[in-house]
Amino acid sequence: VVYSVLQSLANPLNKAIGAAYAASAAFCVLQTIVLFTFIRKNSLQRRYGLCKSAVPARQFLYYVPLLILASGNLWNGAAVNYSPAEAACRIACMLCVGFLEEVIFRGLLFSAIAKDNIKSAVIISSVTFGIGHIINLFNGSGMNLLSNLCQIVFAIAVGFLLVTIFY
């Protein structure tokens, strides 16, 4: 909840200070530091998958197709139309959001529910990850309904994929 509220508050703050993604980046970095510090201080790295894998590196080659899929937005080229500061803020957001969402949905939520029922944990983690993106309709990001619904469906599918990899 804190993550969603802070990220939603960041959009109007970005506009108010006139620096695109500056508040978003600051909130993301702060939350990442707090969460990682908590996990490390309580020795929870292994529990939440933040440690060296016991799986041989060679088996990670099976994930190469996922990297190809993830790069889909770059297939037609990329143009950076941002100042270096804005680009840095956007990159910080992307990296921190990825970390935060993985730890929240796959680490905390999935791990808590999986103690009782793996099937429910997979479904709940995937669906809440997807449904969580509905906030983009209300947080001032400017996303229209159809785009947001597509994002939700895609996020549920990606959430399912990522939780099966995590498990």
Language-model features, listed with the residues they occupy:
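Hydrophobic cores of alpha-helical transmembrane segments in multi-pass inner/ER membrane proteins
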Residues: F27-F38, P65-I68, V97-I104, G159-F160
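Hydrophobic alpha-helical transmembrane segments
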Residues: Q59-V64, A88, K119-I124, L149-V153
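Alpha-helical transmembrane segments in multi-pass membrane proteins
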Residues: V1-I39, R58-Q59, Y63-V64, P84, ...
